[in-house]
Amino acid sequence: MRITRALVTGGAGFIGSHIVDELVSKGVETYVIDNLSTGTLDNLAQHKASGLLHFMAGDAREVEELLHDTSIDVVFHEAAIASVPKSVSHPLLVHDVNVNMTLQLLNYCVKAGVKRFVFASSAAVYGVLEGRATEDMACRPNSPYGAGKLAVEDYLHAYRRTYGLETVMLRYFNVYGPRQRYSDYSGVITIFINKLLEGGRPVIFGDGLQVRDFVHVDDIVQANMLAMESANAVGEMFNVASGRATSILELVRIVKELVGAKGIEHQFTPPRPGDTKFGLASMDKIRAVLGYDPKVEMQGGLKGV
């Protein structure tokens, strides 16, 4: 599919800004809608002189007012409250942003004749896992965040069947990399690094034996570009991960070595509601269908965080 104009919601944020980087490098005229609640214009500053970037401050629900009659070929929907803990403490807010806002964006896409919609879903749709997650397994989310992402996936299937909108769902696992924001709801890698750099003791929820599948943001971008370009992607869900298992205890050890803080002891606290013990992806489908090949290994990828 030939792409001349793309919209990235949440395009000033961690993952969205990296997608913008790749689109601009491909010569795609790129529109960004972001309310800057977690994103920053610093993430887009390198594109000011390109003539290809158009930034609009606002909510994705305002897409019609912001874009007017601009013709868009593909939408990358990255805007969300991406936090399991926040969905537990504020379920109605997270549902409104992650589900209701997406529905309004989908309605815009149908009215405006958008060809393809690439959705940032999540491994949280699976719930409690005992082995590698495969896309055809039953999803039983154990958090409001995961339930919301799964609800949107169902809507995307319905919009494809009803209106012909080409939809692709990318189930991100634990994403890390440059520009990841540090806050209470950040990814665990960013939290550990910042805590150790401040001389504090990193906090591990549970026993630290939880297994995660960490994937670098560059590989997330690769998956998004394949989702944009491949006819085989339409109507499909794909795990996006590295396929490599890392325990939280092993992660703490690696991060301590990286920042030169081996002498700082970590501390344990009870597990949080909605957290899972095991989170590892099967990569078979995305490799076979899209040719996805994760490039960044953790030791090298952490150095750029």
Predicted segments — roles?
Residues 66-70, 108, 195, 223, ...:
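CheY-like receiver
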Residues 17, 107, 150, 154, ...:
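Generic recognition of well-ordered alpha-helical segments
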Residues 131-132, 142, 154-212, 217-226, ...:
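NAD(P)-dependent short-chain dehydrogenase/reductase
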Residues 13-16, 42, 61, 85, ...:
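Short, flexible micro-motifs
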Residues 197-305:
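C-terminal substrate-binding subdomain of Rossmann-fold SDR/epimerase-dehydratase oxidoreductases
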Residues 22, 26, 108, 195, ...:
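Short alpha-helical functional segments enriched in proximate histidine and acidic residues
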Residues 39, 61, 89, 97-100, ...:
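Residue-level signal for the nucleotide or nucleotide-sugar donor/cofactor binding architecture
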Residues 1-175:
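N-terminal Rossmann-like NAD(P)+-binding domain of SDR-like oxidoreductases, especially those catalyzing
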